[in-house]
A protein has these predicted regions:
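Generic hydrophobic, helix-prone segments enriched in Leu/Val/Ile
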Residues: 16-20, 78, 103
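Mid-chain, well-packed structural core segment of small domains
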Residues: 36-79
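Catalytic nucleophile-His microenvironment captured as a short glycine-rich beta-strand/loop
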Residues: 71-95
């Protein structure tokens, strides 16, 4: 989670770790609590976009999201089950291949 956020924001891993730790202490949240990192993005001015659905009301995979929804020249933090990943300039960046996972909510950075 810290890796994805730091990559998307262009910050160091240590900077994001410290920011999340301090915010977590202030709000009584664990460092990796989803409410903590969602609040972090909100405080920085990034709004959560709702989970996209296809015309037949199915969820997009990360690969489909990158091809069809992600904006060229933009960075997106994408929530998938128990994980967040980054799509930057329509390309997936992660330590493992999660292109077949379903997309939840996302943030445009």
């Amino acid at each position: 989670m810290i890796r994805a956020i730091s990559f998307a924001l262009g910050k160091t891993w240590e900077e994001v770790y410290r920011d999340l730790a301090e915010q977590g202490i202030e709000n009584g949240l664990m460092l990796n609590d989803r409410n903590n990192w969602k609040l972090y993005l909100k405080v920085l001015g990034y709004n959560m976009e709702r989970m996209p659905k296809t015309l037949n009301n199915k969820r997009y995979t990360v690969e489909q999201f990158a091809d069809e929804i992600a904006r060229k020249g933009c960075t997106h933090i994408v929530k998938i089950a128990n994980h967040i990943t980054v799509v930057k300039d329509k390309k997936l960046y992660d330590t493992w291949n999660c292109k077949n996972k379903c997309v939840g909510n996302y943030w445009i950075i």
